[in-house]
Design a protein with these regions (language model features):
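Accessory carbohydrate-binding/adhesion or oligomerization-edge regions at the termini
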Residues: 585, 593-635
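Catalytic-domain carbohydrate-binding cleft regions of carbohydrate-active enzymes
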Residues: 91, 104-602, 608
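Conserved, charge-rich beta-strand/loop surface module that forms ligand/interface-binding patches
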Residues: 383, 417, 426, 711-746
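Solvent-exposed beta-strand/loop surfaces of large extracellular or lumenal domains
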Residues: 56-71, 580-600, 708-731
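Sec-dependent N-terminal signal peptides
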Residues: 4-14
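N-terminal accessory segment at the very beginning of proteins
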Residues: 19-202, 208-211, 218, 225-227, ...
């Protein structure tokens, strides 16, 4: 050996250090740490003096998920090289005293049946896209952010610059000693595993308040109390459902004289009720509630509480500040924000306001929280969501998308989009791809925020909105633009009424699908490749998506022709299933691609055969009407089948679901030869307000000829519903704890 003393010095200086084979999880190799979170997700850290980070961040919110020692193996290869294997990965690491990189680290995984090599060099070539922060001022397609899902089978999130969360508040991290913090999602072809991994490290998407997924009315207009109530009357008189009424800026005063302002006015921010338009806000909200509708208040908080506000003196006193010197809005100051919520929000909430529309557009003023690296939008979304939980309710976010981790604050508001066909087509594509990053629930401006009136476009946009997280209309302060669905012309009104009624009837399915998203992190609106990624055709049509497990949609986003305004859309029907047109009951076998033409009143929407689609009779309050009659729509399978769909129910508002307080009911479809059996199994679980009994209505479109029908062993005679054009079996009100079995003999 030529230079034993030099080698000895290297060891003394820490330039290289041999370590014993690590055990446990995380795996520590001197200043390197590798944490196995799931079989397909791991974390790479490098920190001088081993000062690793265990506090949560906005993205890495859940530090409790670790792969058990029984589910991975560490083998020493010699020469400070180690092999770590999980059920999905083989990791090879050479401990050389440097951060994890291209030469000392690699992971091997399977993609399309072949072994591939992963390194942590973040070159994203084949990413399948994700959300955008906002569609403000957007007129057509724009580049989307990355999502987790990639045809390369991996994605890396670098969390090194993120602030920590300590005792519920932001805390800067030591970026000098902690120099590497990467989360490596290496999932191959298993897209659902990648989404589940997001939930493992970042927390699962919470259950939303049920009414969030109902029907909304929103408009930038200065309505009076009487006009707000007349809007609710109009929905009832014109036979449209309604769940949520949004009070845009006109609820507060416009008399600010100081402040940063926005878009030509200093009055975007405000917290004092405008008593000239709304003399008794508490009474107004109480009356809206009495009619079964919730209230949301618009909020642009960037100018904080200023001298013209009626709560200014009390706010400044609580802050211990001189009223002669107004305070800037300060997201990074815990005392400021707690005092702000107390004085700006609590009075309106105590009047009955249900949640806030956080209309933050001020990243150009405050891109980051003062004193921290977190973006203002990230942190304000977190704080507002927490505040809406203060009365024991589920949080209710309603804000723009803030990036990784913001899925914990649903629902997202997509911004002030232009009303045109290109924008509609992009929203269809964007909504499906957004779930790739956990942005599961968009509340779009259905019909577009600004632009020339176009009733046909509004109808087609409504059809898309009926198959998204929220059917929420909105428009700017323009007398020509009002998205109330009965003012667009007789034919357009009838077409939209059909969609609004469908939305109401589908609520049991929608809410059950929301629970599925909470449980699995699989999106509500999801691209075809999430379920059918091995088929190349699943990647080809970005205008087609699954809505939950049973519905397939391809909304029309182009103007029609002729008297019927007929337009078409390309639809791929996945192999292995049979699909039925929701409106005409026409059958389409899987494995084919068709161009479907539809008049204005319909769009391409299909139901998977061989499953039970849970619905409810039409109700003007879709999200709050008790489910006393469960509608079971069943289309036949192509052959023998045995499939179970789970209906989910809870109180729709509280956080009791977190403690397992909810109910599920299995809905089983079984076909054996010429006998089809639909079984409603006994409800499992209970919750506050649960109905102990319900009736059932079995709808059998496309059933063909059958000899007889039995309900719990007794022969019954189905009725024929002329509007649905199908046989219907009625089952009287029954104890939900008792099984109901309906047999159809072909």
């Amino acid at each position: 050996m030529k230079h034993p003393f030099l080698i000895f010095l290297l060891f003394l200086c820490g330039g290289f250090s041999a370590v014993a084979q690590p055990s446990g999880n995380p795996l520590v190799f001197g200043e390197n740490r590798l944490t196995l979170i799931t079989p397909t997700l791991f974390r790479l850290e490098f920190a001088h003096d081993g000062k690793f980070i265990d506090d949560p961040t906005y993205f890495a919110y859940d530090r409790g998920s670790l792969l058990p020692a029984s589910e991975f193996r560490v083998r020493e290869l010699g020469g400070n090289r180690y092999e770590i294997t999980t059920s999905a990965l083989r990791i090879v690491y050479e401990h050389d005293g440097f951060p994890f990189g291209l030469l000392n680290f690699a992971a091997y995984y399977k993609l399309n049946g072949k072994e591939k090599k992963f390194t942590n060099r973040c070159i994203f070539r084949n990413n399948l896209g994700g959300p955008v922060e906002t569609l403000d001022r957007v007129t057509g397609e724009i580049p989307m952010q990355n999502g987790l899902l990639s045809r390369d089978g991996w994605y890396v999130i670098d969390d090194e610059r993120s602030d920590l969360l300590v005792d519920g508040w932001l805390c800067p991290r030591d970026t000098k000693s902690h120099v590497q913090d990467q989360y490596c999602f290496v999932y191959g072809n298993d897209y659902k595993a990648a989404l589940a991994d997001l939930g493992a490290i970042s927390g699962r998407v919470p259950m939303t308040r049920k009414y969030i997924h109902g029907v909304w009315y929103c408009r930038y207009w200065d309505y009076t109390s009487e006009e707000f109530l007349s809007i609710i009357d109009g929905y009832e008189e014109n036979d449209f459902p309604l769940d949520n009424l949004v009070f845009d800026m006109g609820w507060h005063t416009y008399d600010a004289r100081i402040g940063t302002g926005h878009a030509g006015s200093r009055s975007w921010t405000g917290y004092t009720w405008e008593r000239k338009r709304i003399p008794d806000p508490g009474a107004l909200i109480a009356e809206v509630h009495r009619r079964g509708v919730t209230v949301s208040l618009n909020d642009h908080p960037h100018d904080g509480i200023r001298p013209h506000e009626e709560m200014y003196a009390a706010f400044m006193a609580d802050m211990g500040a001189d009223p002669a010197h107004p305070l800037l809005f300060d997201l990074g100051d815990r005392k400021y924000m707690e005092t702000f919520f107390k004085h700006a929000h609590h009075a309106s909430e105590d009047m009955g306001a249900d949640f806030w529309w956080l209309d933050w557009q001020q990243n150009y003023l405050y891109p980051e929280v003062r004193g921290y690296r977190s973006t203002s939008l990230q942190w304000i979304n977190e704080l507002y969501y927490r505040q809406t939980e203060r009365k024991g309710l589920r949080g209710a976010g309603y804000s723009r998308w803030a990036g990784w981790g913001d899925h914990r604050h649903p629902i997202q508001f997509s911004g002030d989009a232009q009303a045109n066909w290109e924008m509609l087509a992009f929203e269809v594509k964007l909504t499906a791809a957004s779930g790739n990053a956990g942005c599961y629930y968009w509340a779009h401006d259905i019909g577009g925020f600004r632009g020339d009136p176009n009733p046909e476009l509004t109808v087609r946009w409504t059809q898309f909105g009926a198959l998204s997280a929220a059917l929420r209309v909105h428009s700017t302060k323009d007398a020509r633009l009002d998205r109330r669905p009965w003012i667009s012309g007789e034919r357009e009104t009838a077409a939209m009424r059909r969609m609004y009624h469908m939305r109401s009837e589908l609520m049991p399915y929608i809410y059950s699908s929301v629970w599925q998203t909470h449980s699995t992190m699989v999106p509500l609106n999801r691209p075809m490749y999430i379920d059918y990624g091995s088929d190349e055709r699943a990647y080809e049509n970005e205008q087609e998506f699954l809505f939950g497990d049973i519905l397939l949609a391809a909304p029309i986003a182009s103007p029609g022709e002729g008297a019927d305004k007929t337009a078409s859309q390309k639809v791929w029907f996945p192999t292995g299933d049979v699909w039925y047109d929701y409106f005409t009951h026409e059958r389409f076998d899987g494995g084919q691609e068709c161009r479907i033409a539809k008049p204005l009143e319909e769009f391409p929407l299909y139901v998977r055969g061989g499953w039970v689609l849970p619905m409810q009779p039409y109700t003007p309050r879709p999200a709050s009407t008790p489910l006393t009659t469960l509608v079971l729509r069943v289309y036949p399978s192509a052959g023998d089948a045995d499939n179970t769909y789970t209906l989910y129910e809870d109180d729709g508002l509280s956080r009791d679901y977190e403690r397992g307080i909810h109910a599920t009911t299995e809905l089983n479809y079984r076909r054996a030869g010429d006998v089809t059996t639909v079984t409603v199994r006994p409800a499992a679980g209970s919750y506050r307000g649960q109905e102990p009994r319900r009736a059932y209505q079995l709808q059998l479109p496309a059933a063909g000829e059958f000899r007889r029908v039995k309900v719990n062993g007794r022969t019954v005679k189905p009725a024929f519903d002329g509007q649905l054009r199908c046989p219907v079996v009625e089952v009287p009100s029954t104890d939900i704890r008792k099984e109901v079995k309906i047999e159809i003999f072909g």
